[in-house]
Amino acid sequence: EDDTLYQAQVNKVDYILKKLHLEEGMSLLDIGCGWGFLLIEAARKYKIHGTGITLSHEQYAEFQKRIKDQGLEDYLTVELMDYRDLPKSGYQFDRVVSVGMLEHVGRDNYQLFLDCVEKILKPGGLFLLHFISALKEHPGDPWVKKYIFPGGTVPSLREILNHMAEDNF
């Protein structure tokens, strides 16, 4: 309640990392890794081997700098990659996380996104998907679609659960 916005973000990442049940040496993929905070925390606290993917050249460059500045080159990598290219990458991960990225995928691509995750998740692996949800399926507010999630939408929990069932998540 009295936390700063920064502390609330730190708390959210800590909570997500606990939910992933990470163990030293595990592999973790962050789809839409942003500036790398989640993976940096995971590497520091759990000694995992993490990969982040992003479409942003600015985030890619800054995350690479942070990896080097914090001496985490043996633990972390970041790639400029679209999630749709993951299946042909040959990668396999113990854990996959995506925080606040699904909204940008767009309703027509939810199943493709989940199919891509299913193909790179090791048997017995764990996938944590964090997204903003709506109560019902709807096309969305034009302003939000233009300025917040261009090309995307806010999904309902029901539609994501239905898509997840297709991949046995």
Outline where the language-model segments fall:
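Conserved Class I S-adenosyl-L-methionine-dependent methyltransferase catalytic core
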Residues: 1-19, 23
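Conserved class I S-adenosyl-L-methionine
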Residues: 25-34
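Conserved SAM-binding loop of SAM-dependent methyltransferases across substrates and taxa
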Residues: 35-46
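Conserved SAM-binding strand-loop segment of SAM-dependent methyltransferases
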Residues: 71-83
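A short acidic, Gly/Pro-enriched loop at the edge of an enzyme's catalytic core
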Residues: 84-96
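A short glycine-rich, Lys/Arg-flanked "PGG" loop and its adjoining helix->strand segment in the class I
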Residues: 111-124
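Conserved beta-strand signature within the Rossmann-like core of class I S-adenosyl-L-methionine
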Residues: 124-132
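Short, glycine-/aromatic-enriched active-site segment of Class I SAM-dependent methyltransferases
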Residues: 133-151
